[in-house]
Amino acid sequence: MLESKLINHIATQFLDGEKDGLDSQTPLFELNIVDSAAIFDLVDFLRQESKVSIGMQEIHPANFATVQSMVALVQRLKAHPEQGGAA
């Protein structure tokens, strides 16, 4: 499941492997878990794991604010691949 893979990835990359308190609704920017530079790591992870094309127009903090918002982005892009743009 993408949600658990994302949580594990975020914990490994940004929290020294610590998942306590990290769930699908944790506000990643508000808690300084990720910053704007980390979005590109997350984009790469989502592209590899989900095989979706994420265009530049989709790369903004609202789509990466929580694990839940990233999963929703992937689901939307899978349902409407024309919205993704170039990979």
Curated annotation (Swiss-Prot):
Origin: domain of life: Bacteria
Residues carrying O-(pantetheine 4'-phosphoryl)serine: 36
Keywords, comma-separated and alphabetical: Phosphopantetheine, Phosphoprotein
Record carries keyword tRNA processing: no
Free-text disruption phenotype from the record: Cells lacking this gene show a white phenotype and produce 2-methyl-3-n-amyl-pyrrole (MAP).
BP terms from Gene Ontology: antibiotic biosynthetic process
UniProt feature coiled coil, ranges: none
InterPro entries: ACP-like_sf, PP-bd_ACP
Pathway as given in its UniProt record: Antibiotic biosynthesis; prodigiosin biosynthesis
Signal sequence bounds: none
Domain Carrier: 1-78
PROSITE patterns: CARRIER
Protein function: Involved in the biosynthesis of 4-methoxy-2,2'-bipyrrole-5-carbaldehyde (MBC), one of the terminal products involved in the biosynthesis of the red antibiotic prodigiosin (Pig). Carrier of the L-prolyl group transferred from L-prolyl-AMP by PigI.
Name of protein: Probable acyl carrier protein PigG
Annotated organism of origin: Serratia sp. (strain ATCC 39006) (Prodigiosinella confusarubida)
Designated gene of the protein: pigG
